[in-house]
Amino acid sequence: ETNKKGRTRKDHGAEKRLVVAGFRVVDRGIHAPYTHIPMSESATMDVSDLVKEMGKRAQNAARELAILSTDQKNAALGTLADLLLERSDLILAENRKDLQRAEKNGISGALYDRLKLTPERIRNMAEGVRDVISLPDPVGEEIERLKPRAGLDIRKVRVPLGVVGIIYESRPNVTIDCAILCLKSGNATLLRG
């Protein structure tokens, strides 16, 4: 399949191989070949080197995300919504560990509540993903067209930014919200929450 820029795009199916916000969905598991840096490696890296490396990997992911079709992005989002529900027990178990660490570190009650996931919150997150699927794809949308002189045709078209960095605190649902909006708009994202 060829996109608007004439680049060839391989469609391996959402559940086989699809780049998703810097991650690959492979047989319904998520792997991060672009942005993921193993803990053993990141523990020995200087913070500025770590951030630079993550940025490089995100830029590589951004190139692939920018050329995904609407169907590919929506399929990936659908897979994410399904996985949130299918793996909610695992997500809740990991969240309990986060909550225990937060308590040991003396987190405030308000931050604790924001960090805490419940089955209902996970269902709401999955529903939010499905809501984004129903939104029109902004990539390639013509937002303005001018013909000032004979032969000139000027168009303003929405394109992905590339890599979006977002910093927030203690909100697992914000992780999903940011990732899905960046994916829908064809952008890679670096999240710090």
Language-model segments: residues:
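Conserved small-residue-rich beta-alpha loop and adjacent elements
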Residues: 134, 138-193
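N-terminal Rossmann-like NAD(P)+-binding subdomain of aldehyde/semialdehyde dehydrogenases
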Residues: 38-153
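Short hydrophobic alpha-helical segments enriched in small aliphatic residues
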Residues: 13, 32-37
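Short, strongly patterned local motifs
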Residues: 25-27
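Extreme N-terminal basic, low-complexity initiation segments
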Residues: 2-11
